[in-house]
């Protein structure tokens, strides 16, 4: 017995509904990003299947980007809880085991939108973390205007984290909706007919 064509929709349905809950839900916590990361990780298991003109490879890139950005969005929470070192080790092991290098795809002559987005977002994440680390090691008397800035805006780095992560989450949500439409129309689950009068 062959599986229903609608079974292909299940991971994308889970991504779109859980991402919508995270983005538009009332009083969601930073840890709520783990809910959409579960089906995104499920989508990553299809990396070896290169059918569909590279569509599955692009899905893998979107899922890895979302997982890395989801981990980065939890950085302020984990740093506050004293889990910064565990976060680094887990992130490096995760990307190393996957063989993911965000800037490698740019060497290709046909770099995709998600490859450029991933490279830019990963560069932004690194810059933000370097800025936060450099501010943490500066002595208080080193820069008067810098210490005044952080006294006035103590949550500057968590806000910058949100400003970097939220557009990526919105794009992942829109991508999952686009995949819904593509799979639905391609599998015949939804047939668009034109009535003839």
What function would you assign to each model-found segment?
Residues 1-4, 8, 175:
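Non-catalytic interaction/regulatory modules that flank or connect domains
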Residues 5-22:
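Transmembrane alpha-helix segments characteristic
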Residues 5-9, 50, 54-58:
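Juxtamembrane/transmembrane-helix boundary motifs in multi-pass membrane proteins
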Residues 14, 18, 54-197:
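Transmembrane helical bundles and short interhelical boundary loops of multi-pass, membrane-embedded
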Residues 40-49, 94-98:
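Transmembrane alpha-helical segments
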């Amino acid at each position: 017995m062959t599986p229903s064509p609608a079974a292909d929709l299940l991971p994308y349905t889970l991504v779109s509904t859980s991402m919508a809950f995270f983005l538009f839900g009332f009083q969601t916590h930073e840890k709520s990003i783990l809910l959409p990361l579960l089906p995104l990780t499920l989508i990553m298991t299809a990396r070896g299947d290169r059918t569909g003109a590279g569509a599955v490879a692009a899905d893998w890139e979107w899922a890895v980007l979302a997982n890395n950005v989801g981990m980065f969005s939890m950085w302020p929470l984990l740093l506050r809880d004293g889990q910064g070192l565990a976060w680094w080790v887990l992130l490096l092991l995760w990307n190393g085991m996957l063989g993911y290098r965000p800037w490698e795809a740019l060497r290709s002559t046909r770099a995709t939108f998600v490859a450029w987005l991933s490279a830019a977002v990963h560069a932004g994440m690194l810059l933000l973390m370097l800025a936060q680390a450099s501010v943490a090691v500066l002595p208080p008397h080193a820069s008067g205007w810098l210490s005044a800035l952080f006294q006035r805006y103590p949550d500057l780095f968590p806000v910058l984290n949100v400003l970097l992560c939220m557009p990526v989450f919105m794009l992942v949500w829109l991508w999952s909706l686009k995949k819904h439409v593509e799979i639905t129309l391609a599998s015949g689950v939804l047939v668009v007919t034109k009535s003839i009068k």
